[in-house]
Amino acid sequence: MASTLPLSGVVITRNEADRIGRCLASLAPVCTELRVLDSGSDDETVAIARAAGAVVEHQDWLGFAAQKTLATSRARQPWVLLLDADEWLDVQSQERIAGLFASGHIESRDVWCLPRRTWFLGKPLRFGGWAHEYVHRLSRPDLRYLPVLVHEGPDLTGKRVGHCEARIEHETARSLDEYRAKLAGYARLWAQQRREAGRRAGRMSAAVHAAAYWLKHYVIRGGFLDGRTGWQFHACHARYVYDKYDLLRRTPSA
C-alpha cells in the first residue's frame, strides 16, 4: 500500500498482550495514527502497543460505551477505525478501505458498516447466528456510543450510514472456559440493565428464550453445519440466553 490514510486506528484494552500486536499490525498499513486507550493492564499490553507505534493513554474503566466514546473522540485524524484487541484486518480488507478513500466515496457517509467474521476456538463460523454480522466501526471521531452496560452500539441519529465490504476478523475466545466466563459476566450486566429499566421475567422466560435461540440460530440458520465448533458456540450462547433471563427473574429490584 503506497501510503497511509487520514484515518486513526483506535483500540481499547486491558490485558491484551497476546492479541494487541496482531490488531495494531493490521491497522498500521492504512492508518496514519494508532491510538490505544488502556484501562489498567498489568501485562505487556502497553509496551507492545507503544512498540507498534501507538499513542497509549490510560483511563480507568468507564464501561464499554463510555470507554469507546472517549477513545474515539481523542483521534486526531478525520476518520476513525475502531477495533477491539481481538479483531484484525486482512490484506484484502486493508485494500478495500484504501479503495473507499481513493474513490472519494468515503465522504458520502458519516458512518460505515463493515462485515465481521467470528473465529471460535481457532475456526471460522460460517453458519448460524453470527455468520452474517455487521458492525459500525468506520466513522468520524464525533460518533458516540449509547450509554448501556453491555452490547453497546453507536448513536446513529442523523448519521448517513453506508456499507463497505472490508471484513473485520474477530477471534472471540482464547478458550472455552474463558468464553463461558465472559458470557456469564455479560448476562449479569444485561439483567442489571433490564432490571434498572423496570423489566421483569416470568418463570418460563429463561427456558423459552433459550430454546428459541437454539431453534433459530443452531437449527434454522444452520449453526450445526459448523460441526463441533458450531455446537460448542451455540451451546454457550443458548446458556447465556437462559442465564440472563434467569438472573432477571431471580434478582430482586433495588
What are these regions (language model features)?
Residues 26, 38-50, 61, 84:
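A conserved acidic beta->alpha catalytic loop
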Residues 1-26:
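N-proximal low-complexity "stem/linker" segments adjacent to membrane-targeting elements
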Residues 32, 46-74:
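Conserved donor nucleotide-binding strand/loop of the catalytic core
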Residues 11, 32-41, 57, 85:
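Short beta-strand/loop segment that forms part of the nucleotide-sugar
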Residues 9, 20, 34-36, 45, ...:
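Hydrophobic packing within well-folded, soluble alpha/beta domains
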